[in-house]
Amino acid sequence: MKNITIAIDAMGGDHGLEIVIPACIRAIKNNPDLKLLLVGVQDKISASLKKHGMLSCQQFTIVHASEVVTMDELPSHALRNKKDSSMRIAINLVKEGRAQACVSAGNTGALMATARYVLKTLPGIDRPAIVSELPTMGGKTRVIDLGANVDSCAEHLFQFAVMGSALIQAIENKPKPKIGLLNIGVEEIKGNDQVKRTAHMLAECSVMNYVGYVEGDHFYSGDVDLVVCDGFVGNVALKASEGLAKLLLTVLKESFSRNWLTKIAGLIALPALKHLKNRLDPSRYNGASLLGLNGIVVKSHGGANEVGFQHAIEQAVLEVKNNVVDLVRDQINDFINQGLLL
């Protein structure tokens, strides 16, 4: 597929243009056929592009937006009062067909509310969910939901499993992804009513490859392709994982800097340490998909660096290339036709 066009919320996130523009430059250098619609305050975007010597780059088009959704703004306020925000216009571009996907590092609640209002959910899906990948011993696994829904009933968790499974089939070409349901133990007697009901629904669905309960340490074992949980638990687990990765890398750096002997040992171990850093660096896994919408929306971490935001753009490109929305829609329609979804 050529001439992929992505709408970028250039003003969103903790750092805005300071991170977004350099990340976009990195992305177009890796993707010569990629066009980016930079949505935000025109004068500020132009000045930033000029600063980086990219003002005349044909792969960039500036789309003016006069407003910005702040990181602490209520989603309802942003939805009602920020109709000319960079976030809103970027999502509108997807609805209008001018862009095939949208990427934003902005306010998660506002992004979810706005995307749901503008793009609407797919038939059979009550609520969109956030899914992203985590590193494992054997490669990576995906977790859904990561914060879109703090309270989810069994029916919603079942829908998340359907969508997450379809995403993995589309991107990784795995016909039967292994699905695990996050719980406080692997025994059938463990868990609350919500989790037990979800487990029963998944076990009764022969179409999906449900392998049973998984505990928190299974996030990193690589035993399953998809971990299903509600957004409250998923978000806490994600943030804890990011914090642990940063702690580990910091402790290693300090340990090899203690004296001249440890510094020599560090030089000897440098190739292995670089490999470890690449495996654990949270920025390499940045870019969470908002599944269940009539369009591709990718959420970047608000505090992401250049590499992290670039990875979010790459995730959007990957989903466009693999026709993720169409494949998820087809999977959902199959479930509806079989009476597995309403």
From Swiss-Prot:
Swiss-Prot/TrEMBL keywords: Cytoplasm, Lipid biosynthesis, Lipid metabolism, Phospholipid biosynthesis, Phospholipid metabolism, Transferase
Role played: Catalyzes the reversible formation of acyl-phosphate (acyl-PO(4)) from acyl-[acyl-carrier-protein] (acyl-ACP). This enzyme utilizes acyl-ACP as fatty acyl donor, but not acyl-CoA.
GO biological process, one term: phospholipid biosynthetic process
Keyword Disulfide bond: no
Catalytic activity: a fatty acyl-[ACP] + phosphate = an acyl phosphate + holo-[ACP]
EC number per UniProt: 2.3.1.274
Protein family (similarity comment): Belongs to the PlsX family.
Record-linked Gene3D superfamilies: Isopropylmalate Dehydrogenase (3.40.718.10)
HAMAP family hit by this protein: PlsX (MF_00019)
GO molecular function: phosphate:acyl-[acyl carrier protein] acyltransferase activity
NCBIfam families the record matches: plsX (TIGR00182)
GO cellular component: cytoplasm
UniProt-listed InterPro entries: FA_synthesis, Phospholipid_synth_PlsX-like
Oligomer and partners: Homodimer. Probably interacts with PlsY.
A Pfam family it matches: FA_synthesis
The protein's name: Phosphate acyltransferase
Coiled-coil stretches noted in the UniProt entry, renumbered to this chain: none
Protein location: Cytoplasm
The gene coding this protein: plsX
Annotated metabolic or biological route of this protein: Lipid metabolism; phospholipid metabolism
Lineage: Bacteria, Pseudomonadati, Pseudomonadota, Gammaproteobacteria, Legionellales
